[in-house]
Every structure is written in C-alpha cells, then in structure tokens.
Amino acid sequence: FKKQNMKKKSLSAKKIIHKSLLNHLKNKKINKVYNYFKKYLDENCDKKTRFGVAISGGPDSLSLAFLTKCYAIKNRIEANFFIVDHRLRKNSTKEARSVKILLNKYDVNCKVLVWHGQKPKSNIQGIARNHRYNLLKKICKKKNISHLLIGHHIDDLYENFFIRLLRGSGLKGLSSFGEPIKEENNLIILRPLIKCKKEDLIYISKKVFNFFIKDPSNEDSFFLRSRIRKLIIDLNKQGFDNKKLDLTIRNLKFANDGIDYYVKKNITNNSRFIEDKKTFIINKYFFKQTQEVVFRSISIILRKISGRYYQPRGKSISDLILKINSIKNKKITLGGCFIEKINETVFISEEK
C-alpha cells in the first residue's frame, strides 16, 4: 500500500512538473521557437522515434532539453538525455553534475558520459568533438536510439561556414552544415535548432531554468571559432549582414544538390560494398568522373568505413586521390581506413 501511495505521489509530482513546462509554451517568443522545432522533428521523424539528446549546460543545449521534453510529453514518446564530461577543464565534472541535478528537477534525467584517456595539447576542440560524438554514438547504439539531437543554432551555421571557407572547403562543406546526417548503425543526427538565433535560446534558458553555463573558450581568441565570431560581427558592420550570408549559403546549396545526384550515381555504378567484410571495392571508372564528384564519392566511402562523424581534411583526401591515380599498386591509411590499389581496382576497408 505504501509503495502504491508513493507511486501515486511520484506520478502526481511529474504531472505538476510537466504542466509547468508546457505552460512556458504560452509565451509567444518561446512558442515561436517550439513551433519551428516541432515542425522540424515532424518532418524528419515518426511518432515512434527514440530520441537521444546531447546536453552541455550552455543556453543552446538547455533550450534543446526543454523543447525536446515538451515534445516528448505532448507526443508520449521517450527521450534520453546525455551530458559529455570531457574533463578538459578543472570544473567540468562539477558543471556536469550541477546540470544533471538542475534538469532532474524538471524530470529531464541525464546520463553523464565521461571521456577517459590522455587529453590533447593541440587541436583541442576538434579532438574533443570527435571523442564526444564517439561517446554519444556508442550510447545510442547500446540503447537502440535512432535519432540524436544536437543543439547547433544559426550562429553556429555562420561560424562553420567561415571556418570551412578558411580551410579551403569545397561546395559540399560550405553548404551542407545543419542537414540530417545518417551515421553507421542507422543513427540519424539532427539539428532542430539550426534556424534559431542564439539570443532566443538564451531567452528560453533564462525564462525556463534561470540558469546556463558560460563556456570560457567562447571568448578565448586562442581558438579559431572565437576569432571567427569577432570577424562576423565586423563583417555585419561593413554591410555583409546575415540576410546576405543566408542567401549565399542557399545559392551554394542549390548547386550542391545538383552535384550530389552524380555522386550517388558514381557510388552506385562504380563501387560495391561487401557488408560482412566492411569493404568497398571500387572500379577504374569511379575515378574518371569530374574532380568534385570523385572527391565527394571517396569522402562518403571513408566516413562509412571508419564510422567517424567527421571525415579527414580536404587536402588529405585530394592527396589520396592523386596517389590512387598516379600509382598502380599502393597501400595507404587515412582517417581510420586502409586503402589498397591492386592494378585498376581499389579496396577500402577498416584500418586494423
């Protein structure tokens, strides 16, 4: 009887929490963001989707936690929330715990994933990002989660555009950030806030939780992203505003979609995937397409074989294609893949 009574009290407390969360949707500003979020998920998921949600403690991810929880309550579906503790800063474990405790009060139960092992001294953000996605992918596979939600917003989209431009990215890299990505094991990575402004997400975090963590690296000019952020502010002052940037990205996307058609055709017609050996066999016609089609085709294959969220840098892929075209028999490793050319045939498998 006591157990039943406690269960009833627990359910009653949950209902009160859920009602309080949903009441925030009456706020016009919050409701506008939620409606965009809902539309995005409705278009990319079905009603039985199992969500994983990546949380950090910043305003973007806390807003994502709130919006996903509201969506889960309304649609009676399950959402799993994950915090990654990179242990790169002294206070990271304490911060992860405080975010977990805070969200638990709102019936958002988080699991903390810890990155163990040696920490990098260079390319810190890039290496941390790869480890973060690997941890998230593993837990999603373990829990049979089909969709992982990430809190990237439109400011991230602009920053990534310039970062990729500086690194010499091609059309694909400049226009594809923010699109759904299908990983191995059929995990789909979604960015449902990609058209939302950071200032709106800060507003939601303050209104709902009255809390968010400021990442000191965001203001540190040691990191490229921080310098890019300042560059965008300067460009806005010079007249290259966000509307013009949106138009540029949209035009690049139209051109990109046309090339994608030929990339899919190239992979289908000129390569074969042997699933049990996790190996691609590529014929000589694969490399006789236009440069951009070959580049993208090989990039897709490298990502599929390695299972890594991010592919190798563009220069490394271009160098690989050059070596394949210039040497008959060659063995190369790149991005977690083993590439071997025998006569006119190329084999790409997982690096052991």
Segments and roles (model prediction):
Residues 215-219, 242-245, 310-311:
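Short, surface-exposed loop/turn segments at secondary-structure junctions
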Residues 1-60, 78-82, 86, 115-120, ...:
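AMP-forming adenylation/ATP pyrophosphatase catalytic core
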